[in-house]
């Protein structure tokens, strides 16, 4: 960045996407300040690294700042945004700051409706073990490094590209990965899936002539846009038509294995510790990126074998009394189906107890019918009220109505518990040895999983 920029302020610095960029900037030597509505382990970490953290949004938080960075959740009436404009301090979206960091490196952007965080994390493990040492910005905590960002000494920047508000179009990556295209964030994409597909086409075609797009051929919406892709691309999938292909896929508990092929040539075996057929696809995207960067296949294998997972993606919270408690960020019907299918594949003999907190009224409303049929792999389902994420209620978009419709569509053991604080005690009365309890949602439901672990340990 131009030398006169010294201090950068983040409104909503505790967010997983904002904090990663803030940490990289701190490590680059910039002064960083930020505010959030409440403190967290993220804000505490940033404070230890030297950031000035304010709790609550107020004009006084802007002290000698040169630019203000905001997320899509921050509105124009935020007091810090109002003050910045009064002081004629530039206010930019998070994606624009990420684009500035990417401009200084060769960018690898992982996009797609689902699987971005896991794919980016896997790629970070592979490239790190290959000696490429990328700068990374991830939307989840990479277990191997204990954080969601790292300043590397290499020439690449590896980051998630968030499509939720279309701002990923400001990025200009050298390598662009698209894992899938699905209907989500319909509050922004009023034109539905066709507008979403159009936006991804624009994103892919921003790749330079010397770059590469990596696209999942198994995804029908990606197949639909292929004729409109103008840049060089590589495909991956289970399909025999894919450039990177997986065969002989095996699932054994947390371990997933498959044989990787490139354009008909057998590369070798891949194995990693993360369950689910969807993660086979995520892994193949990483293989494609690594091959494009001339990473030896032996280093790819090593990177996968050392992959330690990422926070809130099928994360074990504890196994007291023979009951496995897992937390997963899945909050879209497709993600829920994939997570529950992963549990069913890896542990076919176990009873699966799913605990779901819908995230956002708009998503619950727009995808209501898909949510109704998303839980068939769960033996027991508990729903709690919607995590609003700052939204106002939408008529009919309630967990109570969702539970009723799920029952009407043939699922038998469904319970609505509006107060999530009561869920751990309810679970204590129904779970038994051998069960797998999975908390699902992008809100606060992970806390109930942790509370259940504590209760089970106390009563063991």
Swiss-Prot record:
GO terms for biological process: cell division; cell wall organization; peptidoglycan biosynthetic process; regulation of cell shape. It holds the Pfam family Mur_ligase_M. It catalyses: UDP-N-acetyl-alpha-D-muramate + L-alanine + ATP = UDP-N-acetyl-alpha-D-muramoyl-L-alanine + ADP + phosphate + H(+). SUPFAM superfamilies: MurCD N-terminal domain, MurD-like peptide ligases, catalytic domain, MurD-like peptide ligases, peptide-binding domain. It comes from the Bacteria. Pathway: Cell wall biogenesis; peptidoglycan biosynthesis. Its EC number is 6.3.2.8. It is found in: Cytoplasm. One of its GO terms (cellular component) is cytoplasm. ATP binds at residues 112-118. Keywords: ATP-binding, Cell cycle, Cell division, Cell shape, Cell wall biogenesis/degradation, Cytoplasm, Ligase, Nucleotide-binding, Peptidoglycan synthesis. It is an enzyme of class 6 (ligase). InterPro entries: Mur-like_cat_sf, Mur_ligase_C, Mur_ligase_C_dom_sf, Mur_ligase_cen, Mur_ligase_N, MurCDEF_pg_biosynth, UDP-N-AcMur_Ala_ligase_MurC. GO terms for molecular function: ATP binding; UDP-N-acetylmuramate-L-alanine ligase activity. Cell wall formation. PANTHER family: UDP-N-ACETYLMURAMATE--L-ALANINE LIGASE, UDP-N-ACETYLMURAMATE--L-ALANINE LIGASE-RELATED. Belongs to the MurCDEF family. This is UDP-N-acetylmuramate--L-alanine ligase. It comes from Pelobacter propionicus (strain DSM 2379 / NBRC 103807 / OttBd1). The lineage of its organism: Bacteria, Pseudomonadati, Thermodesulfobacteriota, Desulfuromonadia, Desulfuromonadales. The gene is murC.
